[in-house]
């Protein structure tokens, strides 16, 4: 979900 900002938290 957070991947849109962090890419690695996905």
Curated annotation (Swiss-Prot):
Main location class: secreted
Residues that bear Phosphoserine: 8
KW Secreted (keyword) present: yes
Record-given protein name: Toxin To46
Subcellular localization(s) per the UniProt record: Secreted
Organism: Tityus obscurus
Tissue spec: Expressed by the venom gland.
Keywords: Phosphoprotein, Secreted, Toxin
Stretches that traverse the bilayer: none
Keyword Secreted applies: yes
GO cellular component, as recorded: extracellular region
One term of GO molecular function: toxin activity
Taxonomic path: Eukaryota, Metazoa, Ecdysozoa, Arthropoda, Chelicerata
